[in-house]
A protein has these predicted regions:
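Short low-complexity, flexible loop/linker segments enriched in glycine and/or proline
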Residues: 125-126, 147-149
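Conserved GNAT acetyl-CoA-binding A-motif
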Residues: 101-113
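Flexible nucleotide-binding loop
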Residues: 87
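Acetyl-CoA-dependent GNAT
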Residues: 3, 7-77, 81-83, 94-96, ...
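Short acidic donor-binding/metal-coordinating loop in glycosyltransferase active sites
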Residues: 80, 113, 141
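Accessory recognition modules or surfaces
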Residues: 91, 109-110, 144-148
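Conserved active-site alpha-helix within GNAT-family acetyltransferase domains
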Residues: 91, 103, 116-133, 138-141
Length: 150
């Protein structure tokens, strides 16, 4: 497959929303509520933050939202269409997020995930993220993880 990554435009908002809903929908029952990414306004995110999409033959198959907070460079949302799981789309976006953080002068990148999304935590640990905090925010038990960049 020949994937391409590009900055998202306002016209991509519906496709980004659909991608996120498809990627996170199976967690609703497990955590007892919609995951936070499913409640975000992606038109707003595209206007205010760094949002990227991965396409395959012109179709959005992955989306990435990055931001800068008081804690540093945030990998806010990473979503892959389920039929593209384990096909390299997530890796492309993780590598891009790290490159963006470095380019903007950060020596680390952080993210958070719901404590019941254990497979995400395992994946992030495999690629170098280390848990550094747990917080209850917006009714969600979150695991914070950070990766040092070299």
């Amino acid at each position: 497959m020949n994937y391409s990554l590009r900055s998202a435009t306002i016209q991509d908002a519906p496709a980004v929303t659909a991608c996120v809903n498809h990627a996170f929908g199976h967690y609703v029952e497990r955590i007892g509520m919609k995951p936070a990414p499913m409640e975000m306004d992606y038109e707003h995110e595209i206007r205010e933050h760094q949002v990227f999409v991965v396409e395959d033959a012109g179709q959005v198959v992955g989306s990435l939202v990055l931001g800068i907070t008081q804690e540093g460079f945030l990998l806010d949302v990473i979503a892959v269409e389920p039929n593209y799981w384990s096909k390299g789309v997530g890796r492309i976006m993780l590598e891009h997020a790290e490159a963006e953080a470095k380019q903007q002068g950060f020596d680390s990148i952080y993210l958070f995930t719901h404590e019941k999304m254990v497979e995400n935590q395992v994946l992030y640990k495999k690629v170098g993220y280390v848990e550094y905090d747990r917080r209850l925010e917006m009714g969600r038990n979150r695991v914070y993880m950070r990766k040092q960049l070299v």
